[in-house]
Amino acid sequence: MNYRPKVHFSAKKNWINDPNGMVYIDGQYHLFFQHYPHAMNWGPMHWGHAVSRDLLHWEELPIALYPDELGLIFSGSCVFDKENISGLGSVDIPMLGVKGKAPLIAMYTSHLVTFENGERKSLEQQSIAYSTDLVHFEK
């Protein structure tokens, strides 16, 4: 028997948390979500990624954002920079037949925990990542 939700998105396996960075691009809904892909309990947060054309049937894509030296990946949002105002994408070069790529930009909170003199300290900062193929992100 399958006990998975029929309408609500759920990851294929392990911990899932808040939805983040939902955006609609060229007929597809992109859903990012806090996710710990290695266990069923809370752990170092990543951003999972799934896409849907109808909000009912979802395809889970590779992990979008991994924890790094700045910390775990917490809440954030996304924007599709269709006009490449940020300059993070590429531009059209018509005489060479090159079509530019607009970036999908993720803005999120990096959460780092350190210990100094036995005391736990937390540092949060805003971070940015972008993708020109809507799957693989550069930080």
Feature locations, PLM:
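Beta-rich carbohydrate-recognition and catalytic domains
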Residues: 1-139
